Amino acid sequence: MAFLGNKSVNLLNLHYGMHSLAVSGGGAFFAVYLLKAGVSLPLVFCAIAAIMVGRFCLRPMILIFGKAWGLRPVVILGTLVQAMQYPLLAQVHGLDIWLLALCLVSAAGDTLYWTTYHAYFAALGDAEHRGHQVSAREALVSAVSIVGPILGGWGLTHLGPLAAFGGVALVQTLAALPLLASPNVAIARTAPGAIRASRMGFAICVTDGWVSAGYYVGWQLVLFLILKESFTAYGGALALAGIVGAMAGLVLGKLVDLGHGAKAATLAFAVFAVYTIARGLTVTVPMALILNALGALAGSL
């Protein structure tokens, strides 16, 4: 269990576990709640697209903040800005000013958080234990992803959006606390050769962004509609997927640390391709539940 000896990574994983509880209990309901709140299906996709455009436009500010402050303060700021989106989400009723505010805040929060979080985790982690540290994080994420959707679905059904998303915002805010005890990481003023070295990563991110629209956002909406727009049933389906993902993540991490990263990646893309095609053929509730659970396996890979 040497991979658990890095205190900084453990604190970061604790933060990410709390963050993931907010994501699975609130963020996973983002698109489907918009649909339920009177935003038409085409406009839901337009809202998601607007957030992505905002993220693209705001991304250069990461370098400004990162160079001035280091990574940790930017991750903390991103965590707090992300928390602000949930109360806004609860106020949306169709195409209104709250939807516009939601798109702006979500774009800012996601830009601040995700770019710096991944860099921060990579900087604090140990190269020789990378696979185990990532798989331990993902196992924790999968575990809270079992509880989060159940609580989110129950809260939206029985307490209403204000209370449910308010609770999610509180959890997201508290997720910043472990970061206060984590070390800061400075950003180099210049990085010669960085663009050339990142070409493959750039290509992977482009393809990842392309498939995410249908594989994640589109599927969430399809699943929600197949489940007759029930927040409780939708949350239960996500919880089932969390169980599968928790078991699959640990196996993958072991393969990576044994030097089989390329094999794991090949297997991941093969499973992903087959699974994506199967999703397009989904027409019944049992089939949707099974494929959604298997999707956690593909996601872990």
Across the structure, where does each feature detected by a protein language model lie?
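Helix-loop boundary and gating motifs at the non-cytosolic
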Residues: 2-54, 196-241
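Hydrophobic core of transmembrane alpha-helices in multi-pass small-molecule transporters
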Residues: 17, 96-113, 206, 286-301
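Conserved MFS/SLC helix-loop-helix module at the cytosolic interface between two early adjacent transmembrane helices
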Residues: 57-93
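Helix-to-loop junctions at the C-terminal end of transmembrane segments
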Residues: 57-71, 156, 247-261
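Structural signature of the two symmetry-related core transmembrane helices
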Residues: 73-88, 166-169, 263-278
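Cytoplasmic helix-loop-helix junction between adjacent transmembrane helices
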Residues: 104-141
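Symmetry-related core transmembrane helices of the 12-TM Major Facilitator Superfamily/SLC fold
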Residues: 163-181
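C-terminal transmembrane helical hairpin of 12-TM major facilitator-type secondary transporters
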Residues: 263-300
